[in-house]
A protein has these predicted regions:
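N-terminal "domain-start" segment that seeds a small globular fold
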Residues: 32-62, 86
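Short active-site neighborhood of thiol/selenol oxidoreductases, capturing the structured segment around
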Residues: 61-84, 88
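Conserved helix-turn-beta segment immediately C-terminal to the redox Cys motif
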Residues: 66, 83-108
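Thiol-based oxidoreductase modules, predominantly thioredoxin-like and allied folds used
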Residues: 102-114, 130-139
Length: 207
């Protein structure tokens, strides 16, 4: 009996280690699949754009006077996008009501085939009501993404229930109240430096 107990625990331990390693590898693989080379503010042309939101067309120009956070992704993104939006949500939670009034966050979906406006609204509201989901036709999205240094590519995954994934740059882009790109942060940035940058821009705005 003791022999079988030892054998059972050894096999169980091996199985748990194997499962842990498998999911660790899967997470790393998926993370790599959803990230490309990052951009810096100097690499970004930027500029105004108009995309569709759940409440109608929204232009970046309409947000003059506010600090804007831009993030490109898609709702089926398994890890990079949720991490980024959770970080942004934590930053927004640290702001005063007056600061929130002068801060806008735009989540631009690169997957218009799956991400309709109703789904985008539910997805962004899950993280924070200040986050607005935007999308449009693929041709329009490509132009906006290129101007903001976002590289992305759709890859078929027939073995996956999703059917395809989208590899994409994952910077959080900060646009100042004048519509100029000021800084970019990696998707896994800590809350503190992002919050510090936003507060700095907001203070400059109110001077």
């Amino acid at each position: 009996m003791k022999y079988w107990k030892k054998l059972f625990f050894r096999r169980t331990k091996f199985f748990l280690v194997f499962v842990s390693l498998f999911f660790s590898f899967e997470f790393v693989f998926t993370s790599v699949a959803h990230e490309n080379s990052e951009s810096t503010a100097n690499d970004i042309t930027g500029g105004d754009f108009t995309l569709n939101s759940p409440d109608g067309p929204l232009s970046l120009q309409d947000l003059r006077g506010s600090v804007v956070l831009l993030f490109f992704g898609y709702t089926s993104c398994p890890n990079v996008c949720p991490i980024s939006l959770a970080t942004i949500s934590n930053v927004l939670a640290e702001m005063s009501p007056a600061e929130l009034e002068k801060t806008r966050t735009l989540f631009i979906s690169l997957d218009p085939e799956r991400d309709n406006l109703e789904l985008l609204k539910k997805y962004t509201n899950y993280f924070h009501p200040n986050i607005v989901g935007l999308t449009d036709e693929i041709s329009v999205l490509k132009k906006v993404a290129a101007r903001y240094g976002i590289k992305y590519e759709r890859s078929l995954k027939p073995e996956s229930t999703l059917g395809y994934v989208i590899s994409h740059s994952s910077d959080i882009i900060i646009v100042d109240p004048g519509g100029i790109v000021r800084k970019t942060f990696p998707h896994d940035t800590d809350t503190a430096p992002l919050l510090k940058e936003l507060k700095l821009l907001l203070r400059v705005t109110t001077l």
